[in-house]
Amino acid sequence: MDRFDDISEGEVDHSFFDSDFEEARKGDSSSVFDKQDDDAEERTDKDTENVNLKLGLQRKEDDLTEKGTESSGKTPPEEHPVEGDNAQTGNSSSSTTSSRSKLGNARVEHKIHLPTPNSLPQTVKDGEHDYYTDGEESTDDEKKHHVRSKSAKLPNNFKKSLSKKYSRSSSSSSLSLSSSSSDTGCSDTGSDVGLSDSSPSPKKHLPGATHLSPKLKYKPGEKSPGAHASGTKPKVGDDAEESEDTVTDVTPLSTPDISPVQSFELGASSDRKMKVKRQENVRQEVYENVEDLKNNSKSLKSAKKGKEKHEPSLTSKSTALDSSLDHRYKQKVLHDTMDLNHLLKAFLQLDKKRPQKHHFDQPSVAPRKNYSFTREEVRQIDRENQRLLKELSRQAEKPGSKSMIPRSTGPPPKLYHSALNRQREQQRIERENLAFLKRLEAVKPTVGMKRSEQLMDYHRNMGYLSSSPISRRVRSTLSQYSSLKGASRTSSATSGLSCKSERSAFNTTGGGLLLRPKPPNVRTAWL
């Protein structure tokens, strides 16, 4: 209640307004608000002077206000005076001079509707347990809260006005700042009027709840932005910048009810549906076009029929002309086809005649080249040649026909003895060759073809040669064997023969010389 006494005595605390506006300057980040705050301070000084002049009139009306406070303490505050205030504050934006005069009247009306101090602690106990219970401390805190909330709400009003016009933003900001300064100096209900201007809801018109428990405005769940601002901002430790951040993003974000994958699927399905609809529309258009064509054809036919009925003579003449033209065209086509057929037949006949002429001319022309014989003689010669060819082919087919033919001709001719000897010698050579060939074919690889075995054979043969005289034939074979050193199979065969001959020679002489036993490994080539 000290606040009301200070106002009645005509003393205004300018430092309080300066501190409040300095806090508002800290909250405002834009350069536009800095300029407008300077203008607002000058105007608030003028408003305070006007308030000091009008305090004399307000003292006379205190008696009336006390009666009004008693009636308002017993009954709840009505909505009509606040609505009147809203109307007056709304009209104050038209001109600055009219707004100041009306705000003076609004202060008088606010004093009428102020609650009694008896009702203040009751509202504190009922609505809010976190705030102070003393009337003075609670009112001082309320004063700070409302001033901060008002100063925090001003940037939003400025932002809305700046988006429209710069001139309107300057006028509205000056009016709002002047009204806020005058309201804070007179009473706390000025903040309620500002709040009711931004969000006129019936739940906000309880003065006790708005002054002492600002959280109650947020608890009932009001959806207007003014209610959110009044519910979130009036905290003692919060700064102006934090309050601006909380005020800007108040509206709930619209979360999609469908996941992005489903939305893509729905989009694809919608695209398919649109394509199907387009195809159906195209089909319908095609069908409609076909139906239109049919209808047009029917209409044309009906029109032709009507014309034929009205003009039978003309139609008969036209049909006669058409029939004659068709007949002529058909005749031309028939003549053309007949001509083509005749030409094809002629070409085919010529093609058939040409090979026949060649076939008949060949036998007549060929015998004329040989003028030594007549045609009959040539034919007889051909027949004889054909017969001889057949006989020769038959003889060639029979086996042994060549050997039989010379024997059947006659006895063999007589030969001289020299020829006979040559023939016999030749036959003997052939027989030996055949026998040698058979031996070579039957020969298998020998076992003793190693170097050590060949050396043993060589030394043994050399011992045989040095111990007894041997014939020239044996010596020649041994010399050949020693030179070849058993490299070939023929040499091994000759060595075996030489060994046999040596044995036979020793046996015939009857010498008592002892011979080395033949190793069992050594074998002849033909065994």
UniProtKB/Swiss-Prot annotation:
Residues 92-101, 168-182 have a biased composition (Low complexity). The keyword Phosphoprotein applies. InterPro entries: Cfap97/Hemingway (IPR038791), Hmw/CFAP97 (IPR029488). It comes from the Eukaryota. Residues 1-322, 393-413, 506-527 are annotated as: Disordered. Residues 273-310, 368-443 form a coiled coil. Residues 183-201, 248-262, 313-322 have a biased composition (Polar residues). The modification Phosphoserine is found at residues 8, 19, 138, 213, 243, 324. Residues 1-28, 58-69, 270-295 have a biased composition (Basic and acidic residues). The keyword Transferase does not apply. Keywords: Coiled coil, Phosphoprotein. The modification Phosphothreonine is found at residue 133. Pfam families: Hmw_CFAP97 (PF13879). Belongs to the CFAP97 family. This is Cilia- and flagella-associated protein 97. The gene is CFAP97.
